[in-house]
């Protein structure tokens, strides 16, 4: 089954699902710590630029879902669906206030003719932000939002891949401090909890991954894409936001690097991967 996760196709995408920001996000979105207020106009501009990079610049077909004021966190579409090849797992987010976000995502993915699996077990919780797919296997963070039963249902859904669980400490999600920066490359933050999680992933895996260590945990959340006309593409946080981490990304000479601002959504725990669901549709379907 290893060919399914062949690194040559890792990062390929044809479509991206995103969702507009509701104005309720500024005051009502969930956040781990009370901090600076969200500048909503700026958040919208940053989100539009992010969507523009994925659509206009990189050529993905954008499926744009409308905002829902009753769902202040709905821009963070990553948490409600895990898509791998032609299958989509509609999750059961750990925060009860977010569960209705899955409805519109399910409709959108049905229109794209993916095989839909719904997480209906009331004992299961899973946020997509806790799911790291490496192209070879899944790592699932066990956090305040994702539990063992959620990880088991993910494993049942994607049977072709090994699934390992990783305890998440001092962070909202597994991908709050790591992500894939290339076909075999894990971007990881420098904090003790991030490094501990990486060690567990390395112990769990039969495969040896390269690592890219960045000083700032949140800057370790980046988006890698393999675009046939452009090659390796990486969306990462800007030098203005994270100068030291940006310097690390700038050493990746084989990648087309696209710095993206995300200062406003980060105030409500949103990182780069949070606001999109990437899908690779076969051309003939």
Curated annotation (Swiss-Prot):
Q: Does the keyword NADP apply?
A: no
**pH note:** Optimum pH is 7.8.
Catalytic reaction list: N(omega),N(omega)-dimethyl-L-arginine + H2O = dimethylamine + L-citrulline; N(omega)-methyl-L-arginine + H2O = L-citrulline + methylamine
Activity modulation notes? Copurifies with a tightly bound zinc ion. Activated by release of zinc. His and other agents that promote the release of bound zinc ions activate the enzyme (in vitro). Inhibited by S-nitrosylation. Zinc protects the protein against S-nitrosylation.
Active-site residues, record numbering mapped to chain: 173 (proton donor), 274 (nucleophile)
Tissue specificity annotation: Widely distributed, highest concentrations found in brain, brain cortex and kidney (at protein level).
State where substrate binds.
30, 73, 78-79, 98, 145, 268
Q: Which residues carry this modification: S-nitrosocysteine?
A: 222, 274
Q: Any idea which UniProt keywords this protein has?
A: Acetylation, Hydrolase, Metal-binding, S-nitrosylation, Zinc
Q: What class of enzyme is it?
A: hydrolase
EC code: 3.5.3.18
Checking Pfam families in the record gives: ADI (PF02274)
- Top-level taxonomic group: Eukaryota
Amino acids binding Zn(2+) = 274
* Bridged cysteine pairs (disulfide): none
Respond yes or no to whether keyword Acetylation is given for this record.
yes
Instruction: Give the family per the record.
Output: Belongs to the DDAH family.
Q: What does this protein do?
A: Hydrolyzes N(G),N(G)-dimethyl-L-arginine (ADMA) and N(G)-monomethyl-L-arginine (MMA) which act as inhibitors of NOS. Has therefore a role in the regulation of nitric oxide generation.
Name by which UniProt lists this protein: N(G),N(G)-dimethylarginine dimethylaminohydrolase 1
What organism does the record attribute this protein to?
Bos taurus (Bovine)
Source lineage: Eukaryota, Metazoa, Chordata, Craniata, Vertebrata
């Amino acid at each position: 089954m290893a060919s399914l996760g062949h690194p040559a196709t890792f990062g390929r995408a044809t479509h991206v699902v995103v969702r507009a920001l509701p104005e309720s996000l500024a005051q009502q979105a969930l956040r781990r710590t009370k901090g600076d207020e969200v500048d909503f106009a700026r958040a919208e501009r940053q989100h539009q630029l992010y969507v523009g990079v994925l659509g206009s610049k990189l050529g993905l077909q954008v499926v744009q879902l409308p905002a829902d004021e009753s769902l202040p966190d709905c821009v963070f579409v990553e948490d409600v669906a895990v898509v791998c090849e032609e299958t989509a797992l509609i999750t059961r987010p750990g925060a009860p206030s977010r569960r209705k976000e899955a409805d519109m995502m399910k409709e959108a993915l049905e229109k794209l003719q993916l095989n839909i699996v719904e997480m209906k077990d009331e004992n299961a919780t899973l946020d997509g932000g806790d799911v790291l797919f490496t192209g070879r296997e899944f790592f699932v963070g066990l956090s305040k939002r994702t539990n063992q039963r959620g990880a088991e249902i993910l494993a049942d859904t994607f049977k072709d891949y090994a699934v390992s669980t990783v305890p998440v400490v001092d962070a909202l999600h597994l991908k709050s401090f790591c992500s894939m920066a290339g076909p075999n490359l894990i971007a990881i933050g420098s904090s003790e909890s991030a490094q501990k999680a990486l060690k567990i992933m390395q112990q769990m895996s039969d495969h040896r991954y390269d690592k890219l260590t960045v000083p700032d945990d949140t800057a370790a959340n980046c988006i890698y894409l393999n675009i046939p006309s452009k090659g390796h593409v990486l969306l990462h946080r800007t030098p203005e936001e994270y100068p030291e981490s940006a310097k690390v990304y700038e050493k990746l000479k084989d990648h087309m690097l696209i710095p993206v601002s995300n200062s406003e959504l980060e105030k409500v725990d949103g990182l780069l991967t949070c606001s999109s669901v990437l899908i690779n549709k076969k051309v003939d379907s």
